[in-house]
Amino acid sequence: MGYLQMGGIGTFSAMALPVPLAPVKMLIQEERGVSFQVGPAFYRRQSSLARDLGILIAAVHRQQTGSLRVLDVMSGCGVRAVRYLLQARADFVWANDACNQLTDLLAQNLSQGHSLDEKSEAVGEEDFERWRITREDAHKVLLDCALRKEYYDLIDVDSFGSDTLCVGPAIGAVKYGGLVYLTSTDGLCAGGRRRHNALSSYGAFVNPMPFANEIGLRMLIGCAVREAATRNMTVTPIFSNYAYHGPVFRTMLRVESRKRLVNKDYGFIVYCKRCGQSQDIQFEDLGDIACCCAYPKEKGSVVVTGPLWIGPLHDRNQVEGMTELAREWGWINSVGARSISNSPVDMHILKELLEVMVDESQPGLPSGYVRMDQIGKRGKVRVPRRKDFIDRLQQEGYAASRSHIEPRAVKTNCPMDQCIELGYGSRSIVIQ
């Protein structure tokens, strides 16, 4: 049973008169035990991992603050909204999608919020006021919220391409201390193939670099940093996630009030094509850009990308909190364990991703990563095993970790020439 709000065109709500819903004929999908129908909406099963991350931090936020009001401005079939409602136990979820054909489908999926869970004995009137559906332009919805001072704990903007129009309004419609979940699928800008598009959409001039997929995350965060600064706010990433299908770049940001932009984590990345060394540069050091390698300098041998985010991609404490909650929910049991809603494969992937995010959060790691095959190519040696190489780097006092973006790479503050030297002393077998 759905609920139709009679007071406005195109607005459906759980807080009004009940009307029967038209049936949507579609095979039922399931994520982590939550069933839903897709209908004519776009749905990608591979993105369920990113939805897992969003649900976990939403639940952690509710535990920490006692409040979770969610605005999902590009809902599609509503799988994210339903999971926020049922799994993160959101107090209220507003699901919006501009497509008129999805309204009944959204209502059908969100009506699961009226069902009794295993521990509930009764449903009060407030349980029927936990969700709302609209079919408005996402940009308009966000601006209206800011104008009415109707702020949310978490705003999910699942956009595609290089559409950053909603980034600023989303930051303006979230509570101080709240979360904004941003998405981009602009692999061409991340790869430096559309530099002027990147400049207009993200405020960064992006040159081709060998860690393009990390650039995709950093330019998206950098865009949010710039938008927040114009509103006397700051944003810092709770976690950032790259997925190869698409590609898809996602980041969950914490929004705080601050009157001045602190630019230590907002700057430029410099890369030397001759030696393969990259470094982070502050605004104050732009006039001193150079590479200290012994190779003769040629025009274009040193390239600069930015301004963008050059700080940590994740908040270690928050990711550890997400990990603990995922373990409590049985989402990351040991491989081989299985619950009704979790396959061993899903559990292993989520567990490994959270572990790598914690590794990537260690202090001292710069932007970018070094692919193992590049070390072998530049040093003219067989490629060392990644794990052995990371152990060797840490023994030498360098920060080093895996990369969740590129499994054949390491993140380290060790200079490239030292990486090559250490590569000679590591176990020389080809990485699989």
Name each model feature, range by range:
Residues 2-432:
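SAM-dependent transferase fold signal centered on methyltransferase-like domains
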